[in-house]
UniProtKB/Swiss-Prot annotation:
The modification N6-(pyridoxal phosphate)lysine is found at residue 55. It comes from the Bacteria. SUPFAM superfamilies: Alanine racemase C-terminal domain-like, PLP-binding barrel. Pfam families: Ala_racemase_C, Ala_racemase_N. This is Alanine racemase, catabolic. CDD domains: PLPDE_III_AR. It is an enzyme of class 5 (isomerase). Belongs to the alanine racemase family. Substrate binds at residues 154, 322. GO terms for molecular function: alanine racemase activity; pyridoxal phosphate binding.
């Protein structure tokens, strides 16, 4: 099967062509909502530049499609996590936007980054030395961001490294420092003392480095106020509809609608065991539906415990299987739900954040875990 033969086919991240008819589930992605979320964030930032974080294949939604939509809103800076993501994104968006590799470049991969026109994020003295060698080999200045560890203890130059560089006037020769940046650990908790501690540490560390624009705010950091905005904000989760202000109404539009197909319906009697391990036994006659969707599609076994059909909640019964989930559809009129019908897993009845709450995780994990077997349907954009 190929797209020329089947115009409804949609390539997944694995390259599989999955038509709507062939897929077990449909993932609808609203690019128009992503664009509106970007506009809302830009409005909060005033004149501050706003990038787009499209790592992990655009949080599982398709980095190339998301970046193209954001480009139409004027976004010209993107962040990915890995060099491979950056190379793929460069092929998708062309030569225009700047693309930064957040995790830094693996040793020896610098020529690939230079060839793809990527901007290194320098997280250590060793990476700085390697990027300077790349400058020498390229025979020209190369762009980079310098990331400092302001208190998250994850990525970035340690304070001692920054202090050592402060007295070395030649340390950054040949490097076009686009930004000095850091990352907030607790921005989704506005009253957490670490936010202000990190902001002050960031100001102290960047003052030791060559003068350059600064970037600190992630999605939630934007909502901490102008003192966190600096010259560039780097929203990711908020673009995709995840609430950047937990505990408050979500200021972002929802972006995804996930529906799974009913593979089979049946009636069972009291006492019948359901699913692997017979972890549930019917306490009376039940109507069941099995959907073609499971943990191989990224739905964690601990994730939200119900689907929805026409506003009616359909609880999961038994364990989530690799390719299927069993629903209790007894609340529906007999025959109302049939094979091939679609039930909602994410959408108006159950947001990404709702599903994450049921699973004891965060919306980022729900989206980034979504697998490649869906038919992906893009609207808007």
């Amino acid at each position: 099967m190929n797209d020329a033969v089947n115009p409804t086919a949609a390539k997944t991240v694995t390259g599989w062509p999955v038509s709507e008819a062939a897929a077990g589930a449909i993932l609808t992605i609203d690019l128009g909502a992503i664009r509106e979320n970007y506009r809302r964030l830009k409005a909060l930032l005033g004149g501050v530049h706003c990038a787009g974080v499209v790592k992990a294949n655009g949080y599982g939604l398709g980095a190339a499609k998301v970046a193209a939509a954001l480009t139409r809103e004027g976004c010209d800076i993107f962040f990915v996590a890995l060099l491979a993501e950056g190379i793929a994104l460069r092929k998708a968006v062309g030569t225009g936007p700047d693309i930064y590799v957040l995790n830094g470049l693996p040793p020896g991969s610098e020529p690939e980054a230079v060839a793809a026109g990527l901007c290194a994020v320098i997280n250590s003295g060793a990476q700085l030395k390697a990027w300077r060698a790349a400058v020498h080999d390229a025979g020209r200045r190369l762009p980079a961001a310098i990331q400092v560890d302001s208190g998250m203890s994850r990525l970035g130059m340690a304070p001692a490294e920054v202090e050592a560089l402060a007295g070395d006037s030649s340390a950054f020769d040949g490097i076009d420092i686009k930004y000095v940046m850091s990352h907030l650990a607790c921005a989704d908790e506005p009253r957490h003392p670490a936010n202000e501690q990190q902001r002050l540490a960031f100001e102290r560390l960047r003052a030791m480095l060559p003068r350059a624009p600064a970037s600190l705010a992630n999605s939630s950091g934007i909502f901490l106020g102008p003192s966190y905005h600096h010259d560039l904000a780097r929203p990711g989760a908020a673009l995709y509809g995840i609430n950047p202000t937990p505990g408050e109404p979500n200021p972002m539009l929802p972006v995804v609608w996930l529906q799974a197909k009913v593979a089979q319906t049946r009636r069972i009697e009291k006492g019948a065991g359901i699913g692997y391990g017979h972890s549930y036994h019917a306490d009376g006659p039940l109507s069941l539906a099995t959907i073609s969707f499971g943990y191989a599609d990224g739905w964690l076994r601990r994730s939200a415990s119900a689907a929805w059909f026409e506003g009616v909640r359909l609880p999961f019964l038994g364990r989530v299987s690799m390719d299927s989930i069993i629903l209790d559809i007894s609340a529906l009129p007999p025959g109302r739900l049939r094979e091939g019908d679609l039930v909602e897993l994410l959408g108006p009845s159950q947001s990404v954040d709702d599903a994450a709450g049921h699973a004891g995780t965060i919306g980022y994990e729900i989206l980034a875990s979504l697998g490649p077997r869906f038919h992906r349907h893009y609207v808007g954009g």
